[in-house]
Amino acid sequence: MVCLVSRTGRQSQRYNKGRRQVVGCIPYRLKISSDGTISDEFEVLVISSQKGHALMFPKGGWELDESVEEAASRESLEEAGVVGNVERQLGKWDFLSKSKGTFYEGFMFPMLVKEELELWPEQHLRQRIWMKVDEARDACRDWWMKEALDVLVQRLSLLSLKPMEEDENLPLISIY
């Protein structure tokens, strides 16, 4: 069962030298070709901002009672209504919030989506849209999220050169 309430407030969030630490996730889905290689076609899931004027990847504050990977998973569930395998970190970015004028540390992770939920905590606040990578790069509001997407594309392109073995533990599935 999924909790249909998002965490709110900043009292239990992590800070480093005055910078709020936020964690984001790039939900994606792959296609595996018949010869066992990963197709270069994959899509990423973007969400609308709460006010609906911008597109981005799920992200939010990293809470004191969770690991960074747990935070990435929670944000994807709360904001985009997806669950899956959180993979190795894409990187850390320091950025300035245009609206608040404060600095943040942003950690980004890829998530191979295993399930899209029909009900999720912020479904009435946000839209979710599957896009091709180029479309998402153009649509995404934040430069640091675009850079994280480029890291993911590079990582997955390296995987696509290698045929999949049946006993490999890579969390790759075909959802097309």
UniProtKB/Swiss-Prot annotation:
InterPro entries associated with the record: DDP-like_NUDIX (IPR047198), NUDIX_hydrolase-like_dom_sf (IPR015797), NUDIX_hydrolase_CS (IPR020084), NUDIX_hydrolase_dom (IPR000086)
GO molecular function, one term: metal ion binding
Organ and tissue specificity: Expressed in roots, stems and inflorescences.
Any Pfam family matching the protein: NUDIX
EC number: 3.6.1.-
This protein's GO CC annotations: mitochondrion
Ranges of residues in domain Nudix hydrolase: 22-153
Keyword Magnesium: yes
Subcellular location: Mitochondrion
Cofactor: Mg(2+); Mn(2+)
Keywords per UniProt: Hydrolase, Magnesium, Manganese, Metal-binding, Mitochondrion, Transit peptide
Protein origin, superkingdom: Eukaryota
Top-level EC class as recorded in UniProt: hydrolase
Residues reported to bind Mg(2+): E75, E79
Positions occupied by motif Nudix box: 60-81
Transit peptide: 1-21
Function noted in UniProt: Probably mediates the hydrolysis of some nucleoside diphosphate derivatives.
Family of the protein in this entry: Belongs to the Nudix hydrolase family.
Protein name: Nudix hydrolase 18, mitochondrial
Organism whose genome encodes this protein: Arabidopsis thaliana
